[in-house]
Amino acid sequence: MQNDIKKNFEIIKNKYGDVASWAVWKSPDNDNLATNMDIDDLFDIERNPELLKQLQNNIIMVGYNFSRQTDDFPKFHNFHSFKGDNVNHTTLRNASKIRYAFKGTPYWGAYMTDIIKNHPESKSKNVDLSNLDEDFRIFRDELETLQADNPVIIAFGSKVYTLLKNHLKPQEYSRLIRVTHYAHYNDGCATHEGYRSKVLNQLSID
C-alpha cells in the first residue's frame, strides 16, 4: 500500500471492514487444506505488525455477493472465518481454495471485496441487480479510498467479470482478468491443486 500505510489500513478497516478483506490467511494444517481459515488476530496490526508488508492496494479481487448474513461479524471476515462462526463446511472449503491458489504468487495480499454488498444470498440467480449504479459508486469509492492507481482487477467467475466489463471504463484498471470461481468443481477444479493450476494458467503465471 502506498503513502501512510497504517493510516490507510485503518481508514479501509473502518469504512469497508464489514464487507471486504485481504488475500492473506494463516497457513493450513498439512493434512487438511481447509483448516485455519479463521482471522483471530490476523488483521490486528498491533499483534501482527508484519501484516502491512503483505497488503497490496493495486490488486483487487472481486466476488459477486455475500452468501450469508453477516451481522456482528468481525472486521475483514469476508473470504475468511472466525471463532464461533458456524459457516458451512463447503463454503469454508471453497474459500480455502483461494488461499491455496494465490499462496506464493504476486497476487497474495490483494484487497478483496464483492460488487453486490449487504445482500446475503447463496443463490446467485436471486441476487438483486436493480441498484448497480450505487454498487459501482461504492466500488469506485473503495478504489479511491485504497488509493489504487490503475489496478489489476481479478474477477471470480463470469458474472462478476461481465458486470465489471460493462460498468467500468477501460482507463479505470490496467488489467481485468476473469478467473474460475472458487466454488466451481468441474474442469479439475474440485481439488485445491486443480483450482490453483487453473487460476495460475488464467493469470499467465508459470
Predicted regions and their residues:
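Short, flexible coil/linker elements and helix-boundary hinge sites characteristic
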Residues: 16-17, 169, 204
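Short beta-strand scaffold positions
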Residues: 155-156
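Short, aromatic/basic amphipathic alpha-helical patches
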Residues: 164-171
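Short, flexible loop segments at boundaries between secondary-structure elements
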Residues: 172-206
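Short alpha-helical interface elements
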Residues: 163-164, 204
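General "foldedness" signal
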Residues: 73-76, 124-126, 167, 188-196
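A polyanion-binding, active-site-adjacent surface
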Residues: 2-151, 160-162
